[in-house]
Amino acid sequence: MKREYPESPLVGVGAVIVARNHGLPQHGLDQPDEPRVLLIRRGTAPLLGEWSLPGGVLECGETLREAVAREAFEETGLVVEPTEMLGVYERVIRGNDKGNDKNDKRVRYHYVLIDFLCHPAGGDLKAGSDAADVRWFTRPELPALKLAYDANDVVLKGLNRTQI
C-alpha cells in the first residue's frame, strides 16, 4: 500500500524511548539522574527535518510490539523493550508537499499511530534508515523542538510514567 495519497489509513507505531544513564555509554547518556527521551530528526517525508518519535508502518503478520521494536532498532540502533501502550493518535496531512495550495484537500498522508513506552535493552546508538539524526533530550529541552502534532503530549506522558 502506498504511503503518499493512500486509499485508506495506514497503521503506524511510535517508540517513546525513555532512559537514564545506567553505565551504558553506547546509549549516549551522560547525566545519570535526569530522564531523557530519544528522538530522531526525520530524514524523509512526511515531516522531513523535524524531530519526532522513532517509528513507522506495521508490516503484515507483525505484532504491534514487534513493529515498534523493529522500527526503533532501524532508526536508532537500539534494541528496546516495549512496556506499555501510551496512546492511539491520528495524523492526517492534506494537500501538496509545499503546503501552499489551500484548495488542495486531498489526503496526502493518513496514519493511525499507536505509541509505546520503551526502554533501551542493548545496541549502539546511531541514526539509521530514514532518520537523519538521533539524540537524547531532557524535559526542559522539549518546548524548543516544536514536536509534530501529538508527539509532545505522548513524550511527556512517557516521561511521567517512567519508573527507572
Where are these regions (language model features)?
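Active-site-adjacent beta-strand/loop module that shapes the phosphate/pyrophosphate-binding cleft
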Residues: 90-124
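A short coil-to-beta-strand element that immediately follows conserved catalytic motifs
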Residues: 79-88
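Nudix hydrolase/Nudix homology domain
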Residues: 124-164
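A structural signal for short, well-ordered beta-strand segments
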Residues: 15, 85, 116-118
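Conserved N-terminal beta-strand and adjoining loop/helix that marks the start
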Residues: 1-37
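Conserved hydrophobic "DFG−1" position in protein kinase catalytic cores
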Residues: 17-18, 39, 118-120, 136
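A generic structural micro-feature
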Residues: 5-9, 50, 101, 105-112, ...
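Conserved Nudix-box catalytic region and its N-terminal flanking loop in Nudix hydrolases
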Residues: 32-74
